[in-house]
Each structure stands twice: as C-alpha cells, then as structure tokens.
C-alpha cells in the first residue's frame, strides 16, 4: 500500500488521504468497542417510535470512517447508505465490508453530512446514525439535513465518546494527569497553529464537547421524544483540554426539560478496556496519521518524555490498567 499522506480538511483532525491498512487496523483497535446492549438501546428506541416504517428500510451512517457502524446497521435495515467527505475513509470502509460480504447492502457516498440533502430525497430514510462526528459538523445545518432525510417517525441516533480515562481511582490520580498532558501536548501545535477558519471550527467543536452536547438544539416543530443518555458525565467529553487551546472554552445548555429526558449513569466499567502503555499510546497516535512525520522532525520529543513518565506511573512496560470512557447518546424522533 502507499504511504499515508495527510491533510486537514475540517480543521479538526488530520485525515489520511491514501489507504494504508496498517493505520486503520491500529485505529480500530485503539477505539472503544460499541457494545451489543448499546446498539440494542438504539434499535429498541427506533422500533418503539417507528413500528411500521416504509419498506425497504433505509439507514444512513453519516461520517462512516472505516465503516464499522455501517456493518452493524446491516443487521437491522434492508439498505444502508454510508457517507463520508473523505474518499480514503470510504475506500477503507468498502474494502473491510467487502471482506465481510456486506457490500451488497451498502451504498458508499462521498459527501459531507451537511450536503446529504443534495444527494438523497426528503423522507427517504427511516434511521440516521451520526457516530463520533456531530460536534465536528456545522450542527444546525447538519440537523436540518438529517430532518430532510428522515421520514416522519424516523430516528436520529447521535453519539460521541471522549478521551480514555483510567477507571480505578488510585490509578487515575497518578496516571490521568500525565495522559491529559500527553494529549494536549500532541494537539497544541495543531490547534494553536491553525488558520483562523480552522480555529473557528476547533472552538465550535470544543464548546460543544465541553457542553456534553447539551448545546445542540432540537426544535419542537422538527423533533420529539428527545433522550440524552450520558455515561460518566463527570468526566470531560472533549479529547483535548484547555492547555491545548488558545481560545476560551464556553460550555452552554439548551436542554428543554419539558420536552427532553436526560438519563445519567456513572459506570467505571462502561465499554471497559484493559490497556498497557503501548495501547494508550496507540489511541493518541491514531488521532494523527502524520505522527511519524512529527517524530522525524523532533517536534514530538517532549511528548516522549511524558510517555516514559506515564509508563512508570502505570507500573512498567507490561502493566495493564482498566480504561473507561465518557459517552453521550442522543436519540430523537422526526415529527
């Protein structure tokens, strides 16, 4: 395969622009695994609010990335439309689903979430998933597009997870501040050196994540039965912290308590992983596909010092520690 080149399309994260399978294997291995009961919660909501959908049933996976959510949706829907603005992501997702024999159910579309309404007709979908992407979008435009795509009683499911967090309190006290420093040091040059347009995108996203998506508005004339499920909401949802940013972080909330239900749970075992230092490193480094280029230029040396510090705090090279995640899931029904 060709080496991975990178670009910064959205101003949010560096995106791979050529298909290098090794990177994507590492990316998926470094991500939390969406549990079966998590998907069941979503599907149960969909079935309860849309008992007689038009057939064939159509689901959208917006911002599909390497396509793991599209694969899961094939279990529940007749057709799946997986979209992403990055052609490399679509090539990866298509190749992976070809191996699984699922491509006959999936249509791959290169388009941004905000512009899907120019590709698909109104009311053409029963379900739309926006996994790990909503804060990275122009949210009002994206929600208008999602409302355009969904037929009445169709379901929107949007979720996001934050940085990995050490579960056990004594371990977290020693290790989490070091991991937070590693992430912030890794990203500060990307954020602080961003051009103005990208900086605006970074701030918008950071504000939304520090709000735990509570600043995402669901107008009553368009959406009903809005549920906001939060796991570990005492932990920051944003991957980057204030030290990586050179702008004020301004969380806010527009939750309507008369129309929306918020369900919170503190669960140190939610999507639990057990990681050693190499797996923690993999999570951070897979956020930036050009990490090897940064290392070769020497701009990553100060971060390596922090990794050694974290390794010692975790108990050495082979020591494994429990990891959990802050997560938010929003479910809403199209009026």
From Swiss-Prot:
Pfam families in the cross-refs: Methyltransf_11
GO biological process, one term: methylation
Name of the protein this chain belongs to: Methyltransferase pgmE
Disruption phenotype: Does not affect the methylation of the naphthoquinones derived pigments and only abolishes the production of pleosporalin A but not of the 2 other final products.
The species this protein was found in: Aspergillus terreus
Family: Belongs to the methyltransferase superfamily.
Record CDD domains: AdoMet_MTases (cd02440)
Chain's role: Methyltransferase; part of the gene cluster that mediates the biosynthesis of pleosporalin A, ascomycone A, as well as a third cryptic naphthoquinone derived pigment, all responsible for the coloration of conidia. Essential for the production of pleosporalin A, but not the 2 other final products. The pathway begins with the biosynthesis of the cyclized heptaketide 3-acetonyl-1,6,8-trihydroxy-2-naphthaldehyde by the NR-PKS pgmA.
Pathway named in the protein's UniProt entry: Pigment biosynthesis; Secondary metabolite biosynthesis
EC number(s) from the headed UniProt entry: 2.1.1.-
SUPFAM superfamilies, per the entry: S-adenosyl-L-methionine-dependent methyltransferases
InterPro entries noted in UniProt: Diverse_substrate_MTase, Methyltransf_11, SAM-dependent_MTases_sf
Record lineage: Eukaryota, Fungi, Dikarya, Ascomycota, Pezizomycotina
């Amino acid at each position: 395969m060709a080496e991975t080149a990178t670009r910064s399309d959205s101003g949010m994260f560096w995106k791979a622009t050529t298909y290098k399978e090794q990177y994507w294997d590492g990316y998926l291995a470094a991500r939390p695994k969406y549990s079966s009961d998590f998907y069941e919660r979503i599907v149960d909501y969909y079935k309860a609010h849309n008992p007689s959908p038009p057939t064939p049933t159509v689901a959208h996976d917006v911002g599909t990335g390497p396509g793991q959510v599209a694969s899961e949706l094939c279990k529940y829907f007749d057709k799946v439309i997986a979209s992403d603005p990055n052609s490399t992501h679509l090539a990866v997702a298509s190749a992976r689903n070809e191996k699984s024999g699922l491509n006959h159910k999936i249509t791959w579309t290169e388009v941004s979430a905000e512009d899907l309404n120019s590709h698909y007709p109104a009311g053409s979908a029963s379900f739309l998933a926006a996994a790990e992407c909503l804060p990275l979008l122009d949210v009002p435009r994206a929600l208008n597009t999602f409302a355009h795509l969904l037929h009445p009683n169709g379901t929107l499911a949007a979720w996001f997870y934050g940085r990995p967090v050490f579960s056990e309190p004594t371990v977290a006290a020693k290790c989490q501040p070091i991991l937070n420093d590693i992430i912030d040091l890794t990203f500060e040059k990307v954020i602080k050196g961003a051009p103005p347009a990208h900086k605006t995108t970074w701030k918008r996203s950071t504000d939304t994540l520090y709000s735990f998506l509570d600043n995402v508005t669901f107008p009553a004339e368009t959406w009903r039965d809005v549920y906001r499920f939060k796991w570990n909401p005492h932990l920051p949802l944003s991957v980057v912290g204030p030290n990586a940013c050179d702008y004020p972080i301004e969380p806010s909330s527009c939750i309507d308590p008369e129309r929306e239900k918020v369900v919170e749970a503190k669960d140190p075992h939610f999507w639990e992983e057990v990681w050693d230092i190499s797996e923690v490193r993999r999570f951070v480094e897979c956020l930036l596909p050009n990490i090897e280029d940064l290392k070769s230029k020497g701009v990553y040396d100060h971060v390596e010092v922090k990794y050694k510090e974290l390794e010692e705090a975790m108990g050495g090279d082979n020591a494994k520690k429990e990891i959990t995640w802050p997560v938010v899931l929003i479910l809403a029904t199209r009026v």
